[in-house]
A protein has these predicted regions:
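Hydrophobic transmembrane alpha-helical segments that form the core helix bundle
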Residues: 1-58, 87, 91-94, 98-123
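Interfacial helix-loop-helix junctions of multi-pass membrane proteins
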Residues: 33-34, 69-74
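Basic, amphipathic juxtamembrane/active-site segments
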Residues: 72-92
Length: 123
């Protein structure tokens, strides 16, 4: 029989491993390949939106959107862009735990930001 402490330790290791792998996944794929709907002139690296890992990464895979609007609490900006991180933030906001959530419309306008594509749900 496995002790509760051993199960807790194993669960912690699994959670940390999945979190680190998700971070590396975004670091590689979302900076190298995927759809780009925005261009940020002068940026050292452009982000890409990687649809297939949106749920695994809590929405962080909408990285091109993040590079376009880094101060936004919501990263899945278009219809069909699942953003579980935003869903959690909304629940926390309703519970009074977080406040002052910023969205692209409430951020200062960026004159250098250029829209490349309009989002298409089958892309």
């Amino acid at each position: 029989m496995v002790s509760a402490q051993a199960r807790c330790a194993a669960g912690l290791q699994i959670r940390v491993t999945v979190s680190i792998l998700g971070h590396w996944l975004i670091g590689y794929f979302a900076h190298n390949q995927g759809r780009r709907d925005w261009d940020v002139p002068g940026a050292a690296v452009q982000g890409h939106n990687v649809r297939w890992c949106a749920l695994l990464t809590m929405g962080e895979s909408w990285h091109n959107n993040h590079h376009a609007f880094p101060g936004s609490a919501r990263i899945g900006l278009e219809p069909g862009q699942w953003d579980p991180g935003w869903w959690v933030l909304q629940l926390l906001h309703r519970a009074g735990v977080v406040s002052d959530l910023k969205l692209p419309d409430s951020l200062p306008a960026r004159a250098d930001l250029k829209r490349l594509n309009r989002y298409c749900s089958d892309a």
